[in-house]
């Protein structure tokens, strides 16, 4: 399942979306803005943009590949 959304990702909702009793783990990565500077300005947030159709197509390809390569039942 690949979802492109504008709101922040809720890790509990993501886990529940692909929960399977046969699975023994749920692995996520969560990036945060670190205390850093860019060109002498404080970094407070990150903004992302996406070409939605391309992003969704590529995201679905990545998930399909992961499902074929690893012994997993789902990916979000």
Language-model-derived ranges and their functions:
Residues 1-76:
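N-terminal, polar/charged subdomain of small-to-medium soluble alpha/beta proteins
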């Amino acid at each position: 399942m690949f979802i492109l959304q504008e709101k922040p990702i809720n890790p509990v909702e993501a886990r529940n979306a692909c929960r399977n009793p046969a699975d023994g783990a749920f692995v996520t990565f969560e990036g945060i803005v670190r205390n850093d500077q860019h060109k002498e300005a404080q970094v407070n947030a990150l903004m992302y943009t996406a070409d939605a159709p391309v992003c969704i197509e590529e995201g679905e390809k990545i998930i399909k590949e992961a499902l074929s390569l690893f012994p997993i039942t789902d990916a979000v």
